[in-house]
Amino acid sequence: MDNHTKQTVQQIPLLTVKAGPRDGDKWIDRLKEEYQALIKYVEINKKADNDWFNIESNPLGTRWQGKCWYIYNFKKYEFDLEFDMPVTYPETAPEIAIPELDGKTEKMYRGGKICLTIHFKPLWSRNVPHFGIAHALALGLAPWLAAEVPHLVDNGIIKHKEDK
């Protein structure tokens, strides 16, 4: 993990409520913590002029969707993102999907779910219940985009909307 990512993650609040979508009122308490951590992460990114996603959930906090983007060669590549909260959350990290990239890279599972098994999942499991959605974005999706978008562009697999 690079120093910038480490410093950013250290500023994201750690969560304390160990609850998943089936845990009733405890889940509501967990969602409050999730939103507080996400708001802080967005503030950190905006302050660093590194705004790269927006996200929202359904009323129950079980289905999340939004947009993420990556700037490469002065062009903005924007993608839809989505994930469902696993029933076993927070023990199991959410599987973030970028459906439009499904099948375009080997670092992705069926349905456009990004591959996070080698580096991210062990880190997540060591930090249950303290890591949440903001941490999954910072430590999972952000590095994945940084590695994969340039590769996909340079190999002609994806094109910028202006180049189509």
Swiss-Prot record:
The active site is at C115 (glycyl thioester intermediate). Disulfide bonds: none annotated. InterPro entries: UBQ-conjugating_enzyme/RWD (IPR016135), Ufc1 (IPR014806). Keywords: Ubl conjugation pathway. The keyword Cytoplasm does not apply. GO terms for biological process: protein ufmylation; response to endoplasmic reticulum stress; reticulophagy. GO terms for molecular function: UFM1 conjugating enzyme activity; UFM1 transferase activity. E2-like enzyme which forms an intermediate with ufm1 via a thioester linkage. Belongs to the ubiquitin-conjugating enzyme family. UFC1 subfamily. This is Ubiquitin-fold modifier-conjugating enzyme 1. The gene is ufc1.
